A protein has these predicted regions:
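Aromatic-lined, polymer-binding surfaces characteristic
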Residues: 27-48, 55, 59-60, 69-237
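Boundary at the C-terminal end of the N-terminal hydrophobic targeting segment
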Residues: 4, 9-12
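Conserved donor sugar-nucleotide recognition element shared by glycan-biosynthetic enzymes
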Residues: 64
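Sequence-pattern detector for short linear motifs
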Residues: 22, 48-51
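Short N-terminal segments immediately surrounding and downstream of signal-peptide cleavage
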Residues: 12-28
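Intrinsic disorder/low-complexity signal
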Residues: 11-13, 50, 55
Length: 237
């Protein structure tokens, strides 16, 4: 019995450590801002919106407090924002995704020690409303990529940061969102999907699934002739 308890305790500690590492990667630092300014200023407007890696770089950029204030003051009673076209049916640049990006921005500022909104009751209320609308409405894009990769990837980061504040109902909603991602595909899509599964595993405190997701990602770090890393070290998708 003592051995079993020790194993469970060690597993819980490992899950906590992984979650802390994720949080450190998600939250911006002053060093991040310096390097991101140099990188992002060199990109064209088209590049800034068309490449997922660039989108993720912008998500690491420190949030503008003035823009955040606008998000707080313009949110509707239902938890939406009037400038987002929630009826959009485009397969690329799907507008409802902006709702998820705003949730992440709000959660980042709420979770950053030293920010003017750190653990702000006003901010927390807005986040709960935004999450509640998404969980209740369950928006679906005609493009599978947003449903299985884009939205879970953005919201997954928010879920991990906001986990201590989530209600049981919100946790169930978060896991449902993350369950849209399953192991499969090849190349970068395979890595993104496995990364989303890993986040779900952390929310479920499922160490076995964490290891499966880790191994799925690691399996793609090889050279080959199909999608992924090529013999000349280029990457094809």
């Amino acid at each position: 019995m003592a051995v079993a308890c020790t194993c469970v305790s060690a597993q819980d500690a490992e899950l906590t450590r992984i979650k802390q590492n994720f949080s450190q990667l998600i939250l911006p630092t002053e060093t991040d801002e310096f390097h991101l300014n140099a990188t992002l200023s060199s990109l064209s407007r088209t590049e800034r919106g068309s490449d997922q890696v660039v989108v993720e770089l912008f998500q690491r950029y420190p949030s503008d407090p003035d823009i955040i204030r606008t998000f707080l003051t313009t949110q509707t009673a239902e938890g939406t924002w009037p400038d987002i076209n929630y009826q959009d049916k485009k397969r690329s640049g799907w507008e409802p995704r902006i709702h998820t990006e705003r949730i992440l921005e709000l959660v980042k500022l709420y979770s950053t020690p030293g920010s003017s909104y750190y653990h702000s009751a006003e901010m927390e209320k807005v986040i709960h409303k935004a999450l509640g609308w998404w969980f209740a409405t369950k928006p679906v894009c005609l493009n599978w990529w947003y449903n299985q990769i884009g939205v879970p990837k953005t919201l997954g980061n928010a879920f991990l940061l906001f986990e201590p504040q989530m209600t049981d109902e919100e946790r169930r909603g978060a896991i449902e969102v993350m369950e849209h991602a399953r192991f499969g595909m090849t190349g970068q899509n395979k890595v993104w999907l496995a990364g989303n599964v890993l986040v779900r595993a952390l929310l479920q405190n499922d160490m076995d699934l964490v290891r499966q997701a880790r191994d799925s990602i690691a399996s793609e770090i090889v050279t080959g002739q199909a999608e992924g890393i090529q013999p000349d070290w280029s990457f094809h998708q």
